């Protein structure tokens, strides 16, 4: 990897961070998509045939299991967002380097150093 240019190393770093972000985003999406299923399963566990749907919903949402699920969902979203910020910073760092190199080439051409 030592033969790679600075820009090549930057894009490789951005790609790795992008992959990590995608993995964390997928994890969060799975948790988020399962939210209604988790709530329904908790309501089914509490259903004795006598409680109303509204009461089952309230009891399920107030349960420790659902609170823990929501906490894990929030933690997954936070991790996903932090990974996204790191990826976007790495991508922008690459773009800044690419722009700087293009500017330097243009300056050399303008000054006549490059045929």
Predicted feature locations:
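Charge-rich amphipathic alpha-helical interaction elements
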Residues: 1-115
């Amino acid at each position: 990897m030592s033969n790679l240019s600075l820009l090549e190393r930057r894009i490789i770093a951005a790609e790795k961070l992008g992959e990590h972000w995608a993995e964390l985003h997928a994890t969060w999406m799975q948790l988020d998509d399962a939210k209604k299923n988790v709530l329904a399963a908790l309501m089914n566990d509490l259903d004795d045939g006598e409680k109303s749907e509204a009461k089952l919903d309230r009891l399920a949402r107030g349960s420790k299991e659902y609170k823990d699920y929501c906490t894990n969902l929030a933690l997954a979203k936070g991790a996903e967002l932090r990974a996204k910020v790191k990826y976007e910073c790495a991508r922008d760092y690459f773009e800044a380097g690419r722009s700087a190199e293009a500017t330097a080439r243009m300056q050399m051409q303008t000054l006549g150093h490059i045929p």
